[in-house]
């Protein structure tokens, strides 16, 4: 935990829970190791920031292999992770829209560039949904005891985030605002 506290924020993107739950010492040699999902949960509760970004192994992901639903990290996320494959593929593009004013969205237009997919989630009680896509959370945030968490349910890079999203003039500001909010630097 002390090493984790050296950082203001943890960002999880395109990583399944098993990456943290099955370190090589445990998987290959059956050795005990700290549960890193518990460490992240406790880190957030004690004042750290957490951002989860969508992708094929984030949230529940492809074939539900992300497996974040039943982990301690779920306790500090502003959304409920599904137990089934949660990928919402939209090759035609779908437009995320801001639905609630918040510091994270300062300087950001109400409509975002289209995305080509996202992870379907359900907002948790106590969370604030700041932007939606197809009626689902796109950006959601939550206070978690002394810390904060945020989710962006699409990827930060292709294929779900096409060029027009990644090169959007507000792209950098959006991520800066999210990081500033979860780290209480705003």
Where are these regions (language model features)?
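Sec/Tat-exported extracytoplasmic proteins
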Residues: 11-14, 44-48, 77-81, 178, ...
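A general structural signal for short secondary-structure junctions and capping/turn motifs
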Residues: 1-2, 42-43, 65, 119-123, ...
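Short alpha-beta junction capping motif
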Residues: 5-62, 143-148, 152
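Stable alpha-helical elements in mature extracytoplasmic
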Residues: 3, 36-39, 69, 171-175
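An acidic, glycine-rich "communication" segment
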Residues: 49-136
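Alpha-helical scaffolding within the catalytic cores
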Residues: 1, 38, 134-138
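Short, conserved loop/turn and helix-capping segments at secondary-structure boundaries
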Residues: 30, 34, 67, 165-172
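Extracellular ligand-binding/catalytic regions of CAZymes and related secreted enzymes
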Residues: 124, 128, 144-148, 154-186
